[in-house]
Amino acid sequence: MRSVGLIPNIQKDQVAEITSRMYKILSEHDIDVYLTHEGADLIGTESAGVSSDVMGEVAEMIIILGGDGTILKAAREYAPYDIPLLGINLGKMGFLAEIEANEVMAYLESLLTGNYTIEERMMLDATVLRDRKEITTFSALNDVIIAKGPFSRIIEVETKVGGNYLETYPGDGLIVTSPTGSTGYSFSAGGPIISSNLEVMMITPICPHLMHNRSVIISSDEVVTAKMKTNYAVVVLTVDGQQGFTLQDGDEIKVKKSNYKTKLVKLRRRSFYQLLNEKLTGGQEV
């Protein structure tokens, strides 16, 4: 490995110390280290700061120091560059991070010697059509969410799968999630958890009315079409909980499997189910 990008979330505790230490060790091993401009300013190495475009072109791996939100942002931003991402958890839950902040030094040798594997995660593409014209497209690692605005009024979302009518969901909205996103908002909305090595999509209604409260798991080869049937409420499309777009009555959102994949660096021999146990129960048998 000849070059590494470091993306620290400068709002997190300990981030300056850990970033500085990693920069020093990687540089001592003759690895070219690039940082975001704000990351470079944080540790006083302004000359190492580059734009995201440059980092995508020169880095062979990107190390992210932050929480799941920081990793999600990097996954979308660097998906076109096909670069493996290593997450170091400085947040709370950390489903996407591979190691915790206090484990960095223990696993650094494995990273330097190439003793790791790469796990690919399916991503989603969401396209908004207005008057049958495409007006914007987003990529997501976790989920695409259609949700009502601040007022307590039910919205209706007509949903089709592969062009076939499925259901018109009355409620607070709809979630289309990847397996990776099944442990996020969809899980909180009552959806099941899907193993991360599967390539499927899941549709989960948000606070649905009466008998509409079941998730539907579909093939990743299908296209989900969700159409707004509401003209009296603010409805927003949210991508990975980070990007938003205001929808209008009659807008269609088409969600499908993306051509991009997120590549996650795996340093630990830990199955998805072991990770699940650690995050949900603290690693205890209950």
Curated annotation (Swiss-Prot):
Signal peptide: none annotated. It is found in: Cytoplasm. GO terms for cellular component: cytoplasm. The active site is at D68. GO terms for biological process: NAD metabolic process; NADP biosynthetic process. It catalyses: NAD(+) + ATP = ADP + NADP(+) + H(+). One of its GO terms (molecular function) is ATP binding. Its cofactor is a divalent metal cation. Involved in the regulation of the intracellular balance of NAD and NADP, and is a key enzyme in the biosynthesis of NADP. Catalyzes specifically the phosphorylation on 2'-hydroxyl of the adenosine moiety of NAD to yield NADP. This is NAD kinase. It comes from Natranaerobius thermophilus (strain ATCC BAA-1301 / DSM 18059 / JW/NM-WN-LF). The lineage of its organism: Bacteria, Bacillati, Bacillota, Clostridia, Natranaerobiales.
